[in-house]
From Swiss-Prot:
This is Mediator of RNA polymerase II transcription subunit 14. The gene is rgr1. It comes from the Eukaryota. GO terms for cellular component: core mediator complex; mediator complex. It comes from Aspergillus oryzae (strain ATCC 42149 / RIB 40). GO terms for molecular function: transcription coregulator activity. Its main location: nucleus. InterPro entries: Med14_N, Mediator_Med14. Component of the Mediator complex. It is found in: Nucleus. GO terms for biological process: regulation of transcription by RNA polymerase II.
């Protein structure tokens, strides 16, 4: 019994006691004696009581009578010592130390807790003193909570130490209480001994009753042994009957048979159960199927006499084939009594009731053997009166199931029950509900409790599996026949019941139920099965639980199959938790499993999701909205999507694969291809939907992968007049913008180029103008534009990574196409021959023999950042994103390459005298001039001195300078008499030409006052036709050839040629300018600034010095 023992220093007051020998559980303590009484004198010896014992103590009150003390001590030694109870006692000091330690720990925790409470500073208004002059202090909720915690701690600890004080006062009398405990234990032990003795005597008396034997009759025994007879038994004098022969015996038996037959037919009331009988051998045999055969006979010829029992045989198994001995005698007595008292009906009732009871007992014994054998711990058997109750699946959670086998009365309410009799009946309680038991295999002839149980369990399993079958078949995947579902059910063998379920095209699942325990068994992937076993719910029925587990497992199998195969195609699994987005709200409620994938060829703000449910497997495209633009990487970096938000999500398919498609690596390769395609198409459809200014078809909800894994196409309406302002491109001057394209553009996906990491999307359209004239002009260098050979169709190729919209590029290219067609029409008007067309350039031939080639380059500038092309950003923008600029390039030996920049500046000016028409006219106008300059500047040996320099002010103004003679001329194209002519004027000052009178005279005679082929002098100048200006320049050059003045030195020419090569290369971006080996580019004072200001007049063009 637990208790508290005071320490040595606390018993009888502080400082008392000497060496104390503790005795616990009757054993003396081995602690050495330590003298603690030196300060109080050696004469004082303290007394310590431990469990009623006194050691080394002398009572001062007994010191007066020493003899009395000795007598009492002697008597006490003769009595046995009471056993001492000390279990559960512990020192009071330990209780105090633990209480103090606990108080210290609680105080430390309190201090830590109060340190975590942040007290808000008190406002200045609360610092005002009240009328009493006493400050209330800080009255913030945090400070008040701190004070309350301190008070609660102090009160709690105070209560604990008050309890310790009470315990300390009680423990000072612990010695007396310990004696009382020992005495109570002694009395209880004695009482139990007395009660045990009485019980033993009663049991002996009861057992001796069976040993009683009656006194033997020795007198009768002695007479029998000596005389062989008993005189007390009278002799009736009967003579023994005469022995019968075989013939007599047969006659008597036949007579008995007739008597029995007549009696049963006319006199006796035979119950319905005994209507099947046979008469033979002097007896009648009544047959009750599956129960017994009863042989009866007569003792007298009188029809009113009773029938007598002869024999009985049971017709069911297991049973005793023949009754012998005491049991047979018991049957004889009971049956004869029943026949005498109640006739055949009473006999049947007795035997029928006996057989029914016997059958129930047999089934009970079989059930007990099963419960002790293989069915251990899964069966519970009870026999209530004549009703056998067998509980099966006892360890299964939920509603219980059991089988009751008992005796039914056979009566039906409202019907005639004269022919009804009791019989064995079944009552089946399945999951707490009584159900019909007609289908249970119950053979009353061959009794087998195991067969009955197996039939009941088979029916129960069939019910569970059929219910699960119905639940699963309601889902769309199985009701539509896309996945197979088969059930095998039986009434007798539970092990043959099962479900075969197709999870995916390549995976199947079998469901069965263990007959003994009732646990459902699902044969699937081990890892998935382990996870599913933890998901079982006791609140669901077995069928619902199986259906739920099958649904989860099917979805897991579908997602696992997708994950394991698409990874081989370069897809990367994306953890949805890293995106900080609740995708459960995105998908329908019936989705059980989902997984996200990303491919390194895709844009980082697009992913695809595979979702699986019992109604179907779907692919989704998911668009993420990121705050930062991530660079392209081969690995999906979740850190760049921490702050991502969900922008859109759309289902794109009703299944992972085509229904008739064989699952394998080729099918997954096609799937990866078409996922990229649907992502590319869906990206552009989503872009058009967000743009809200361009109509398209089909809508996003219907933009799904077709059943044969074909990527759908988009049809968008394109009208040049309704193009959003941000996408509109202003055509250069001279180009006419008109409707040349029909209003419908078809976008189709044409694969992914893994080398370039782009998807190919082709835009198909039709022109409103015939294309026979330029259908064969497709460029061999740029395949982004193709025209149909027959018809009006065209195709534009667009390249972009899957996930990046091509709509801005399509808008640009369609307007480029309009620009190209406008250029083609302009060239046709100018009688120039177009050689090739593409979205980036137009190559054409011009000249009298169409032997000179020029290329018009169409260049467009657009934002490089994808954020600037976002529809949300474009909604607030009114300025166009695109700026178109035309460029012009000439190939060697085209003479116009010398004035390329001047012509380009004219091409892009917005003035009325600029544009493509003006450039075409300039090319035709300046062609004879440029060819003449080529002839004049021809220097095959590259060793002749530099004689002439040509400065191009613009395409219509040239300055010709002969530095050796200090003569300058200006050649200007102007209108004269409604047609263009070239006019040559001298610009040299009198100071420069003062020493060249002879040359001046020659010029006047041969040019100014002369006339030639296509030119004529004007006195102070020369006018020439545009086609004959070469003759004028040839004659001018002959005048200076006659001069003997030497030109520039070769060193000067070489340096000039070098500077021309460097400058022209910097301007044209190639080295074609170096073909004129004696040309020098010398910038005028305004040339550098003018080169960057295309809006200025052409008077400030570059200056080209040509030798």
């Amino acid at each position: 019994m637990p208790g508290v023992v005071m320490d040595n220093t606390n018993i009888g007051g502080a400082g008392q006691g000497s060496a104390i020998h503790d005795s616990r559980n009757g054993m003396p303590s081995l602690t050495p004696n330590i003298n603690r009484n030196s300060a109080f004198g050696d004469s004082h010896v303290g007394r310590v009581h431990i469990n009623g014992m006194t050691k080394n103590a002398v009572d001062p009150s007994q010191a007066e009578d020493a003899s009395t003390v000795n007598i009492k001590s002697t008597k006490s030694m003769e009595l046995p010592e009471l056993p001492h109870i000390t279990q559960g006692f512990f020192p009071f000091s330990k209780l105090i130390s633990r209480s103090v330690q606990q108080s210290w720990n609680d105080l430390s925790d309190l201090i830590t807790e109060m340190a975590d409470i942040k007290v808000s500073p008190q406002e200045q208004n609360s610092l005002q003193l009240p009328a009493s002059g006493k400050s209330f202090g800080n009255q913030s909720p945090e400070n008040l909570r701190k004070k309350a915690r301190i008070l609660d701690f102090a009160h709690a600890k105070r209560a604990e130490f008050i309890k310790l004080l009470v315990l300390s006062q009680w423990s000072r009398q612990a010695a007396d209480v310990s004696k009382l405990i020992d005495l109570q234990n002694f009395i209880r032990t004695r009482h139990q001994a007395y009660m045990g003795a009485l019980q033993g005597i009663g049991d002996m008396k009861r057992d001796l009753v069976q040993a009683q034997v009656a006194n033997p009759d020795l007198t009768t025994a002695l007479e029998v042994l000596s005389k062989g007879k008993v005189s007390s038994m009278s002799d009736l004098g009967y003579k023994p009957p005469r022995s019968l022969t075989g013939k007599d015996t047969l006659k008597r038996l036949q007579k008995i048979n007739r008597i029995i037959s007549v009696r049963l037919a006319l006199y006796d009331s035979v119950p319905r159960a005994f209507h099947s009988y046979s008469i033979h051998d002097g007896r009648v045999t009544f047959v009750v199927p599956n129960e017994f055969e009863l042989d009866l006979s007569i003792g007298q010829e009188d029809e009113s006499s009773q029938l007598y029992f002869v024999d009985i045989r049971f017709l069911f198994n297991p049973s005793s084939p023949n009754l012998k001995g005491r049991i047979f005698n018991e049957f004889d007595v009971k049956i004869n009594d029943a026949l005498r008292n109640n006739g055949l009906s009473g006999c049947f009732d007795l035997l029928h009731s006996l057989v029914l009871t016997n059958k129930i007992n047999i089934l009970f014994k079989q059930a007990m053997e099963l419960a002790r054998g293989l069915w251990y711990d899964v069966l519970r058997v009870e026999l209530l009166h004549r009703t056998l109750v067998v509980h099966y699946w006892t360890q299964k959670a939920g509603a219980k199931s059991w089988l009751e086998i008992g005796i039914k009365s056979g009566r039906i309410c409202g019907e005639n029950d004269s022919y009804r009799h009791p019989n064995l009946g079944l009552r089946w309680i399945r999951d707490g509900q009584e159900v019909d038991s007609e289908e249970i295999e119950f053979n009353t002839k061959s009794l087998s409790m195991e067969s009955i149980l197996r039939s009941v369990i088979a029916l129960h399993i069939s019910h569970i599996l059929s219910s699960a079958y119905c639940i699963i078949s309601e889902s769309l995947l199985y009701s539509a026949g896309r996945l197979s579902l088969q059930a095998q059910l039986t009434r007798t063998e539970p092990g043959d019941c099962g479900l075969t379920i197709q999870l995916t095209e390549s995976r199947h699942l079998s469901v069965s139920i263990e007959p003994m325990s009732g646990a459902s068994i699902i044969s699937a992937t081990p890892s998935a099965q382990e996870r599913l076993d933890n998901d079982r719910s006791s609140d669901k029925s077995s069928a619902e639980d199986i259906a739920a587990r099958v649904a989860r497992l099917r979805c897991m199998a579908a997602i696992d199959e997708i994950e394991s195969n698409v990874k081989m195609l370069g897809f990367e699994t994306v953890n949805p938790r890293s995106l900080k987005i609740d995708f459960r709200r995105l998908f329908p409620n019936n989705v059980l499993r989902f997984s996200f994938f990303w491919h390194h060829l895709w844009e980082r703000n697009w992913i695809v999701a595979a979702t699986s449910s019992m109604d179907g497997d779907n692919w989704w495209v998911v668009q993420l909205q990121t705050t930062t633009t991530a660079e392209s990487h081969s690995v999906f970096d979740a850190s760049t999507h921490i702050s991502s938000t969900l922008r859109s999500a759309q289902a794109i398919s009703g299944s992972f694969f085509h229904v008739n498609q064989n699952i394998g690596y080729p099918s997954f390769a096609d799937l990866g291809h078409y996922l990229s395609g649907i992502l590319a198409v869906h990206t552009n459809a989503r872009y058009l939907a967000d743009l809200q200014t361009v109509d398209f078809y089909p809508p996003l909800q219907r933009l799904v992968i077709e059943p044969n894994l074909q990527v759908p196409e988009i049809f968008m309406r394109y009208e040049a007049a309704n193009i959003p302002e941000v996408f509109r491109i202003a055509l250069p001057s001279g180009l006419k913008s008109r409707v040349r394209t029909k209003g419908t553009i078809r976008l189709a996906f044409h694969g992914v180029d893994p080398c370039k990491k782009v998807a190919t999307i082709v835009a198909y359209g039709n022109l409103l103008i015939p294309i026979k004239a330029f259908s064969a002009l497709n460029s061999t260098r740029d395949h982004s534009l193709v025209f149909q050979k027959r018809g009006t169709g065209f195709a534009i190729r667009l390249l972009a990574p899957p996930g990046r919209p091509v709509i801005p590029k399509l808008m640009e290219n369609l307007q480029r196409l309009d620009c190209i067609l406008s250029i083609f029409e302009c060239l046709q008007r100018k009688k120039m021959e177009t050689r090739s067309l593409s979205l980036s350039h137009v190559t054409f031939a011009y000249g009298p023999e169409k032997d000179l080639l020029a290329t018009l380059k169409i260049e467009t500038s657009m934002p490089s950042s994808s954020m600037e092309l976002d529809p949300i950003f474009l909604a607030s923008r009114t300025k166009s994103l695109f700026h178109l600029r035309l460029g012009l390039s000439f190939e060697f030996p085209n003479p116009h390459r010398r004035i390329q920049k001047s012509i380009e500046s004219t091409l892009n000016h917005s003035t009325t005298d600029a544009g493509l028409d003006t450039v075409a006219e300039l090319l035709l106008l300046t062609l004879p001039l440029m060819r003449a300059l080529d002839q004049i500047l021809m220097n095959p040996s590259n060793r002749q001195p530099l004689r002439v320099q040509v400065t191009v002010r613009n395409a219509k103004t040239f300055q010709i300078h002969y530095p050796g003679q200090s003569f300058r001329f200006q050649l200007v194209a102007t209108h004269h008499l409604s047609h263009m002519v070239w006019i040559l004027k001298e610009l040299s000052s009198p100071k420069e030409r003062s020493s060249q009178d002879q040359l001046k005279l020659r010029l006047r005679e041969r040019l100014y006052n002369s006339k030639g082929d296509g030119w004529r002098g004007l006195g102070n100048g020369v006018v020439a036709e545009t086609g004959k200006v070469g003759n004028l320049l040839t004659e001018l050059d002959r005048c200076f050839e006659a001069s003997s003045t030497p030109g520039l030195t070769p060193e000067v020419k070489a340096s000039g040629s070098k500077s021309f090569s460097q400058q022209l290369t910097a301007e044209n971006g190639n080295v074609e300018g170096t073909l004129s080996e004696s040309a020098t580019l010398i910038p005028t004072p305004n040339a550098t600034s003018t080169r960057h200001k295309t809006g200025d007049t052409t008077q400030n063009a570059d200056i080209i010095m040509i030798d």
